[in-house]
Amino acid sequence: MKLKHLTIFLFIFIYRFLFVKSDCYLINNERPETKITKIRCDDQVISILLNPNNRTDATLEKDTDGKFYFDVVNFPYKDRLCDYTYDIYFLPEIPSLPSVPTIGGSVNFTYNYPCTSVYGRIKPLNIANKIVTPYNINLDQFTMRIQPGCGDLIINSGSRVIYNASYQTGDIPNKPTIDDQGNITIQGSNLYNTQIKINSNDPVENLNPTGNLDSTHSTIVFSLPESQYQGNWTIDVTICDVFYKSYLYTFLPIITVMEGVLNDNGGNLTFTGDHLSVNPSTTISGHFGGKPISCFAGTSKSVICSIPSRSEYGGSGYDVPLNVTIGKYTTNTIKISYDLPLIQGVSQRGTSQIFNVSGVYFSGVISMTIITGANIKTNILKKPTPTLEEPGFFIESNNTIFIFLPNNTQPGFMNLIVGDGGSKSFTSPRYNFKITPTITAGQSFKSNTIGGDLIISGIFMRTVDSDGRDVPLTVKSEPGGPICDPLKDGDGLSFTCVLKSGFGSSHTMNVYYNLLPVGSFVVSYNPPYLASSDQEKDGTIQINGNNLGESVSNSIITVVYLDGSRANGTVVESSHNLLTFQYPAGNKNTASYLFQLGDQISNMAGPFTLKPVIENNNPAVPCGGGMVTINGHYFFNYTKDTTTITIGKVPCNISSINVTTIECVILPNLKSLSPYYTSGSKPLIISSSNSATEKVYQSSITGYSNYTFAPPTITNTSDIDQTALITIYGTSFGDANLEILIDGKPCTQPEINIHTYSSLTCNVTNYDEMLKYNYSNTKFNISISVDGQYFIAQIFQFKYESTISYSENKSSGFPNEMYIGIVAIIIFLALIFFAIKTQVEKYIEERRARKAFRSVDNLRLKLREKHAAEIAKHYSFGYESAPKPNKSYFYDLGKKLSRLPLIRCCFKEHTD
């Protein structure tokens, strides 16, 4: 033994002094597993080994004791520093590690003092008693693979712990699920070493099932026989031997469906579901339609019950409730039916009359009945090959029937009547379904703008709800579009829609049944058509035609002239057959017409040539000559130089002319003309020497072009103002030799409204006398004569109203009775005085008036003779010359007598 130890000692001694030249030493003779922070060296420069197996020199600094020291802890490359010698051993360090999941895996980290002095070998680590050797991924980082685990993560180097951490903690965010196969699934993260413990109020075989963890440690599944769970459960979950959470579950028995068919005779039927396991000591029973029935245990997913016959049950046999009680738990309730036909759904095949009826036990159906509101029944028979012409039904399968309904079927209920074993009949419950009217696609209609009845085709057009009340169809178009009011119909194949007046080339009319769209059709109004045209005296033009509509705001009339230019007229009024518009301003009287109503344009009518139209049928013709204004339209190409106007045969000289107005002047002294030309109604004739003008249009305006040289008339007067001015109103106040007499005295300086000859003003010559004598409320005669008394107005009387007011002077000193008496005497005497004075003045004024009229008559006779002679020099009419004054003594005497006031007032009109 001693020899062996001696041999080892000699080997170490020889190796150390022959092969290892150590110039550094431990300061405190630290043990190999002691952390070395500093070593002392003899030389200032030493050789050190760095990973990966690279030796380099390090320069040391001298300490205060004069020695050189190598500071291991603060060495900048300690993550690459190897042991100095085999006996100067640096304990490895791991400053930090990233979080490690329970699945483990490769981890990158910093590894200080990673290698030994022998060829720079990497120092191994120990994790959970397993050797792990890190390896470089670069000079600064190492990688090691950590095995799956949970809880503490302790890393050792030899027997020394160099890093103490933990795996990531497990987490279960959602409640574990349990499926019908007995699988308990837990999902989360870091579920390594997850276990459950089941606590139940019912006995179970295994309270600690084993789970199957997936590779990602995110799902673990525990499997149990389904029969093991029923009732209330508490599942305790532990992760890595640490309690995590408890979850509560309740497992009640459930039945979902009946297997097989329940016929009239009843029998044992199997009902499938979940959690239906029965222990030997557990009782089981059931209820069918509220009556107890016997049930037997099957499997955990089935139970068997005895169902009575339909006659024993005594009910309708449809939707009978059934449930099962297992021990202290009762299942849910399901409804089952005997094998009787039952409609479960009805659907229309597209928009046809064919309906698909789905349900159960249809094989025995022999007839069907449609029941509508008011209990109207329609029987539909079973046919091998029903058609739309011969409605009926056929059975496709035990669950499907095809029905061909009549066109006039109304919405309502459907009933099935079936055979039952050949001895009984059974009526199934009513199934309510709606038959919706359907409009035949692609229908379009044309209509005049006045509208009319439209017959809309379709099916099921007899509209009535389930209570027998009418449900009208409604028809709507776009906003502002036409209106169509549906009427009730009876055959089911169509309905009538009354289209209101409208216009437009295309309108989509949508049909609604109970506010639901059932189809549409298109309405197109016929385009407008223009035929003939007429002119009106007011200048408007009327066009006859068809489909002209009633919408002025949507109407456009276009006038197309011969040169192709266009202008729009103004539509005044429009009806379906007649259009009235105003011709556009301009100087072109020949044009064609186009009419646009909405988006439709008419034919081009014409060309038409406008004729001049006289509008006023009684223009003011001055009786003694003067201005005549002729209002009308379309005096195109009429000029002063080429146009002549005569009234009867009296010429009217044109002073101005435009498209709508002609003004002309009749020379005065009509008295010099023969009464043949100036009495009665005379035609107005407008002629032109210009070939481009049209003859005045008079054929349709009877009497509108006749004029009368009427004598003046007085209709009213104004009061005489303080300047002695009076206004006289009337007609035909001519301006030739005009004379006005008021109470026999002339009214001077007359001014006439020459545009209408209906008013004049003049100054009253005896106004001062009226004021002086206060002729208040006294009637005065007014007479007017024109053109040397050839035209004399009927005498008009007016009351003179004084503009002077009097005020009563009041005095004192007399008793009231005396004052009243004196006033009464004065008034009486004044009345007598004024009565005498009035009679005397009246006599004097009458003599003065007669004398004045005689003087005026002599003057008038001289003027008339002079006017007649002057006119005769300038005018001649046919073979007749201007009339000459009668020179006989009796003629002059008769004329003079006729001028006397007493004689003149007896005649309504003066003629020669």
From Swiss-Prot:
Subcellular location per the Swiss-Prot or TrEMBL entry: Cell membrane
Main location per the UniProt record: membrane
Ribosomal protein among keywords: no
Gene Ontology CC annotations of this record: plasma membrane
Source organism, top-level taxon: Eukaryota
CDD domains for this protein: IPT_PCSR
Residues in the Cytoplasmic compartment per record: 837-912
Keyword Signal: yes
Topology relative to the membrane: Single-pass type I membrane protein
Spans through the membrane: 816-836
Glycosylation sites: 54, 108, 164, 183, 232, 268, 323, 356, 398, 407, 568, 637, 653, 658, 706, 716, 763, 774, 781, 809
Extracellular face residues: 23-815
Signal peptide (UniProt feature, chain positions): 1-22
Keyword set, alphabetical order: Cell membrane, Glycoprotein, Membrane, Repeat, Signal, Transmembrane, Transmembrane helix
IPT/TIG domain: residues covered: 532-609, 612-686, 715-796
UniProt protein name: Tiger protein E1
Annotated organism of origin: Dictyostelium discoideum
Gene: tgrE1
